Amino acid sequence: MPKPINVRVTTMDAELEFAIQPNTTGKQLFDQVVKTIGLREVWYFGLQYVDNKGFPTWLKLDKKVSAQEVRKENPVQFKFRAKFYPEDVAEELIQDITQKLFFLQVKDGILSDEIYCPPETAVLLGSYAVQAKFGDYNKEMHKSGYLSSERLIPQRVMDQHKLSRDQWEDRIQVWHAEHRGMLKDSAMLEYLKIAQDLEMYGINYFEIKNKKGTDLWLGVDALGLNIYEKDDKLTPKIGFPWSEIRNISFNDKKFVIKPIDKKAPDFVFYAPRLRINKRILQLCMGNHELYMRRRKPDTIEVQQMKAQAREEKHQKQLERQQLETEKKRRETVEREKEQMLREKEELMLRLQDYEQKTKRAEKELSEQIEKALQLEEERRRAQEEAERLEADRMAALRAKEELERQAQDQIKSQEQLAAELAEYTAKIALLEEARRRKEDEVEEWQHRAKEAQDDLVKTKEELHLVMTAPPPPPPPVYEPVNYHVQEGLQDEGAEPMGYSAELSSEGILDDRNEEKRITEAEKNERVQRQLLTLSNELSQARDENKRTHNDIIHNENMRQGRDKYKTLRQIRQGNTKQRIDEFEAM
């Protein structure tokens, strides 16, 4: 029995190991990988390996794995990577797993500087990457340093600014907090929506020469072929959409593209190696097929995938809403519980205050009772004294009357009678005055006793109100709350040094609608505002002496108001012949 071949496939976030038979084809291995990870949008992806000469190569699906130029190692190493890119991630990517794989691959390309990204965009993308990994920022959970082990922004950007690692993390943390409420899957999609507007996103670059021998770059992407000057990979100079191309072929190092416009000459360039032309042809055929497929009605399978994805997304939204509702309910219960505890404490304090007031009222009542008794005693003594004085007065009156009678009965001298009469009259006047004062005093004591009695009654009423008030309510009791492109070049060709492929453009709808696109920053005011704020912040710490060649080109494009899609419209102006003539003249 043939000995199995051990294979290790590395995706962007996992390592898979398989044992395959010597007669296993590339498609069988590919199908095993996508089945394992649950991927249905297989047309974007391929298996990449480093061949015997050290060049990165895509595994041919129609050939046996063992018959291809894979290195003889154990296990045989492959990378599962995106080979083709969508035009618009938001419109085309269906499954969450597809979004995640693109997100991780694009992020890796930006962090390694394979895709140029300006500083302010790099920081904003870094914050979306943090949201995609950690979810909502929580200051209790995400303590200082929680980003210390994360790759956040390209090293180039860090080197260009006078900011420490902590200062970079602080900036990203602030923007992380801005994304509160955004799902992790949504954060990945937002990342890709911004990243797809970067000039180098989704482009495969190849060194070529025109007939004059000028060194140039050929860029192959989802929208067509673009020509770049050797020192500028950001700004294409000439563009050809896939809908303008009817045939592509190569013979040895010569590559020929035949336009649909029969008045236009062939578009010819030269690659340094035959294997580069093979790769260019594969990418052209695959990207052209996807370009045409996107401009035709969806197949039943794609419609079903989209419907399933919508249902899954809807279900996730419902689950999210339920979680948010439950979270808010718990927060409400916690707030109510805290409020009840505060009210309980307030009631206890009020009860203590009532008790203290009661004790004071009882003490005051006791003092007032004692004072009332004292006043009553004083009144009684004053009454007795008034009665005694009244008795003395009456006695004096009687004596006076007796004297008067005696004066009538006896003959006394006028002087003696007058003297006695004057004496008793004076005494009577004194007694009258004393009696009047005592009556006033008695009246005063009676008034004070009445006031004391009124105070006593009032105090008793207050005490009765305190003692009969309903007790504070007891604290509440809480219950515990809880989806291929059919491979372009299946064979390297019936002829060993050449290959030709016809590219059909029939039946497509709105073949150049990509020229109407605008960047995410232009259509999204929030992203535009965030990028402007970040640009202003970073400009204060930027070391202008460390700007790279790409930085200078990007800044000049920005200064002239150019972006990826405005440049695309510009480089496709004129007819095909004019653009081919421009290419030949470069």
UniProtKB/Swiss-Prot annotation:
The modification Phosphotyrosine is found at residues 146, 354, 478. Residues 308-338, 540-565 have a biased composition (Basic and acidic residues). A motif ([IL]-x-C-x-x-[DE] motif) lies at residues 115-120. This is Ezrin. PROSITE patterns: FERM_1, FERM_2, FERM_3. One of its GO terms (molecular function) is S100 protein binding. The keyword Membrane applies. It is found in: Apical cell membrane; Cell projection; Cell projection, Microvillus membrane; Cell projection, Ruffle membrane. Residues 302-462 form a coiled coil. Residues 306-338, 534-565 are annotated as: Disordered. Has three main structural domains: an N-terminal FERM domain, a central alpha-helical domain and a C-terminal actin-binding domain. The FERM domain is organized in a clover-shaped structure that comprises three subdomains identified as F1 (residues 2-82), F2 (residues 96-198), and F3 (residues 204-296). In the active form, the subdomain F3 adopts two mutually exclusive conformational isomers where a row of four phenylalanine side chains (Phe250, Phe255, Phe267 and Phe269) must point in the same direction. In the autoinhibited form, the F3 subdomain interacts with the C-terminal domain (residues 516-586) and stabilizes the structure, selecting only one possible arrangement of phenylalanine side chains.
